[in-house]
């Protein structure tokens, strides 16, 4: 929305400077996007083309002799199609900066002919996007004077960025009203138009619509005997300053009303209208040649104004060329109507038409100004074009039913925290045109017809707040969050974050997969229950809520493999679903490894089969990943038990279940069953795991939140290897537990590094090799100390498992 400073001051009595006005506009929610003081236009002068001859070396160029008022014509080479003798336009001499092309002119030769300047187009001056020809001014434009002064370009132009909910500020009068309400001046009011009316308007209007909301009102008046010449200089200057091209007085008046009062108008040449006017839906395939010289094909979704011969206008969007007004117009029909905002928006989008009328109608114009707008336009036509006004015809309009809001003034403080007095709140609302009835802390507020965006109490609070000024809100320090008791994050949230970090530290990459999977995959992982089917899935293969993270991770890994990335290690920490109630949603940390993506060091260090013969991933990689999550989450690993076997999607002999006690299942790990991989259409070597973070027991509450000091031993750790021959039925975990119990203070870790079965060991026997890490605490251990500890380890394993030390 553009307007000049002088135009604004026609409606606002104020001594405020340009900077003060712009600052206040932004403060009250009308953000100033640009201010153009037009200083760059001062060097341009009005000049007349004395002669125009064809360029000797170029068919599309002309050699002009241009008089700038000093009696010394200068030679200019010009390529504009409308360049001709007698044309009056804007001249830029050598040394002048032309903003639209970002060039400072100099004397030069064009195809061998010297040129001493430039006749400019509107686009070259950044006035508009029109570059079809050079500026063509009226013949009586004063040659030799400043073009900026003549065109009103020395008047600062303010452009504000309007939000769609403020149709009242698509008028300069509406902007002035907001500024006056904010205390920056006084709103000027004009007397109601007064003129003599003679005779009836001979054209009737019929509304033939199946939905009255498409055109809630239509008013029409004839003015006979007009003289449609150029509009006065003051009007032309204002229109040109905001980027509009003056055409003739009648058209310029409608454009002026659009910006001045926010009331789009339209004029028909009465002589070109045949019979009465009908407002109706367009017929399928009907066409109209519009004022932009383009033909549009219409349909039943478009509302049109038609006479007996055909279409004359696309209602609320653009008029037709056939009934347009020109210098020969004697009798004019002035239209002021109301249109459905949604239909206008759809019509404009479907036809690709953007006009100032559409911009206002699709946001909503003031319904109560339909007839006053007609009166004001009639007054301007009589003043500028002469003539005799006929009686107005008004059809369809049933009046505006205003909204009334019961408004407790205490809402201002409740919703904003602002300390605004009741007197100021009421003064602001009255200044904005709201009707206020009642006294005390609760009043009845009538919303004005030009504010369709105001609907309830919160909207009224917003009006008070923006005019009072958000700058008046005193800064308040935030509360002291250090005084908050207890943890801000829940235990589950902390464990979720910890699991992510633990798996990332093992070289795995985090993935985010869909929570929706195909029904076949859901059933493969013990899901597919009717309660977990989506009523409206986004795709046919996303019909069920996932019972496990693994199908999504496996298919994601396969997509990577298909693109040449065969060694993949990815994880996800998210939700799975066992039922349709909140307690049936699980928080799970899951991951898979493919190919040779085994952890071979710290960080993202994977072994690679192509570089050194890395081994394929196996059940032990998945086990290590799963246990790392439990350990990072602070579970007592001595109480964690591992049992053989897992759900059906795992390999029956290469998988395990992680438990804490006989009933608490913490998760599963292992290699995947070949049938599972086949059903998912994935290939390769895979292992994976899932840990149920919500199944972990709550940590015991400690007396203090302070962590104990970290104690590090100054002595070197020592590792000892043992190989025990045990029955095949003995689990490795039992051996680890027995070895650890030999001395929990000195033994800091026990790991299995080899399992061997062979005839040399005997029937149903196996060898389990473990590595025991011994960390001295307060002294260096002697050989006697190690021998005693070794004997205790061997004795504990033999007692617990029946195992003997392998020779």
Curated annotation (Swiss-Prot):
- Respond yes or no to whether keyword ATP-binding is given for this record: yes
Entry keyword set: Aminoacyl-tRNA synthetase, ATP-binding, Cytoplasm, Ligase, Magnesium, Metal-binding, Nucleotide-binding, Protein biosynthesis, RNA-binding, tRNA-binding
Quote the record's binding site residues for Mg(2+). Answer: 453, 459, 462-463
- GO MF annotations, alphabetized: ATP binding; magnesium ion binding; phenylalanine-tRNA ligase activity; tRNA binding
List, for all copies, the residue spans of the domain called B5.
400-475
EC number of the protein: 6.1.1.20
| Domain annotation FDX-ACB: ranges | 713-806
In which compartments does the protein localize?
Answer: Cytoplasm
Annotated disulfide bonds: none
One GO term of the biological process aspect: phenylalanyl-tRNA aminoacylation
Q: Where is the tRNA-binding domain?
A: 38-148
Known partners and oligomeric status: Tetramer of two alpha and two beta subunits.
Q: What name is this protein filed under?
A: Phenylalanine--tRNA ligase beta subunit
Q: Which organism is it from?
A: Agrobacterium fabrum (strain C58 / ATCC 33970) (Agrobacterium tumefaciens (strain C58))
């Amino acid at each position: 929305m553009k307007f000049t400073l002088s135009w604004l001051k026609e409606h606002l009595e104020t001594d405020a400077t340009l900077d003060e006005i712009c600052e206040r506009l932004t403060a009250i929610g009308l953000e100033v996007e640009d201010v153009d003081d037009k200083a760059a236009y001062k060097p341009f002068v009005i000049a007349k083309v004395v002669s125009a001859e064809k360029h000797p070396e170029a068919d599309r160029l002309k050699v002009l002799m241009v008089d700038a008022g000093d009696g010394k014509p200068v030679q200019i080479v010009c390529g504009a199609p409308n360049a001709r003798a007698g044309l009056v336009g804007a001249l830029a001499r050598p040394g002048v900066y032309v903003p639209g092309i970002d060039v400072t002119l100099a004397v030069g030769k064009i195809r061998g002919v010297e040129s001493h300047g430039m006749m400019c187009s509107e686009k070259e001056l950044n006035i508009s996007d029109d570059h079809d020809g050079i500026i063509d001014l009226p013949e009586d434009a004063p040659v030799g004077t400043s073009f900026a002064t003549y065109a009103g370009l020395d008047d600062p132009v303010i452009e504000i960025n309007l939000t769609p909910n403020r149709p009242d500020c698509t008028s300069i009068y509406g902007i002035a009203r907001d500024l006056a309400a904010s205390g920056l001046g006084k709103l000027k009011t004009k007397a109601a138009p007064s003129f003599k009316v003679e005779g009836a308007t001979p054209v009737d209007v019929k509304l033939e619509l199946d939905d009255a909301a498409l055109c809630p009102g239509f008013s029409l008046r004839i003015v006979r005997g007009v003289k449609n010449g150029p509009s006065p200089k003051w009007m032309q200057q204002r229109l040109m300053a905001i980027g509009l091209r003056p055409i003739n007085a009648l058209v310029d008046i409608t454009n002026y009303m659009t910006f001045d009062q926010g009331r789009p108008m339209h004029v028909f040449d009465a002589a070109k209208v045949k019979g009465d006017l009908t407002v109706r839906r367009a017929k399928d395939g009907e066409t109209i040649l519009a004022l932009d010289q383009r033909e549009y094909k219409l349909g039943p979704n478009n509302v049109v104004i038609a006479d007996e011969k055909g279409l004359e206008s696309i209602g609320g969007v653009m008029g037709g060329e056939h009934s347009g007004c020109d210098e020969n117009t004697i009798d004019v029909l002035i239209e002021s109507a109301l249109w459905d905002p949604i239909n206008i928006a759809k019509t404009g989008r479907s036809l690709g038409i953007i006009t100032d009328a559409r911009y206002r109608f699709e946001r909503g114009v003031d319904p109560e100004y339909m007839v006053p707008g007609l009166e004001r336009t009639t007054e301007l036509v009589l003043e500028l074009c002469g003539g005799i006004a006929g009686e107005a015809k008004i059809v369809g309009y049933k009046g505006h039913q205003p909204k009334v809001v019961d408004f407790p003034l205490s809402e201002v403080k409740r919703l904003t925290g602002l300390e605004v007095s009741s007197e100021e709140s009421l003064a602001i609302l009255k200044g904005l045109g709201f009707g206020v009835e009642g006294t005390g802390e609760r009043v009845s507020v009538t919303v004005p017809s030009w504010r369709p965006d105001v609907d309830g109490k919160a909207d009224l609070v917003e009006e008070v707040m923006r005019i009072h000024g958000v700058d008046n809100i005193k800064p308040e320090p935030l509360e002291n969050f250090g005084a908050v008791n207890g943890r801000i994050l829940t235990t589950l949230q902390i464990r979720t974050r910890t699991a992510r970090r633990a798996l990332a530290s093992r070289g795995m990459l985090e993935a985010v997969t869909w929570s929706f999977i195909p029904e076949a995959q859901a059933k493969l992982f013990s899901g597919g229950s009717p309660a977990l089917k989506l009523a409206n899935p986004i795709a046919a293969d996303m019909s069920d809520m996932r019972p496990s993270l693994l199908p999504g991770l496996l298919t994601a890994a396969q997509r990577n493999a298909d693109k040449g990335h065969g060694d993949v290690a990815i994880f996800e920490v998210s939700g799975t679903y066992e039922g349709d109630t909140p307690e049936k949603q699980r928080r799970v940390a899951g991951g898979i490894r493919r190919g040779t993506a085994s952890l071979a060091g710290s960080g993202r260090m994977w072994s690679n089969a192509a570089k050194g013969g890395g081994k394929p991933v196996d059940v032990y990689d998945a086990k290590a990943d799963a246990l790392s999550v439990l350990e990072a989450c602070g579970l007592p690993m001595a109480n964690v038990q591992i049992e053989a076997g897992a759900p059906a999607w795992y390999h029956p002999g290469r998988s395990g279940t992680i438990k804490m006690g006989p009933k608490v299942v913490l998760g599963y790990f292992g290699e995947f069953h070949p049938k599972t991989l086949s059903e998912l259409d994935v290939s390769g070597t895979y292992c994976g795991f899932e840990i149920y973070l919500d199944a972990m027991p709550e940590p015991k509450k400690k007396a203090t939140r302070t962590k104990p000091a970290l104690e590090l031993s100054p002595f070197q750790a020592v590792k000892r290897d043992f190989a025990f021959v045990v029955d095949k039925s003995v689990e490795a975990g039992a051996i680890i537990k027995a070895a650890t119990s030999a001395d929990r203070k000195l033994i800091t870790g026990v790991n299995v590094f080899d399992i061997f079965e062979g005839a040399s060991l005997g029937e149903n026997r196996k060898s389990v090799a473990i590595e025991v890490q011994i960390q001295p605490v307060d002294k260096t251990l002697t050989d006697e100390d190690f021998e005693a500890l070794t004997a205790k380890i061997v004795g504990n394993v033999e007692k617990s498992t029946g195992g003997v030390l392998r020779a």
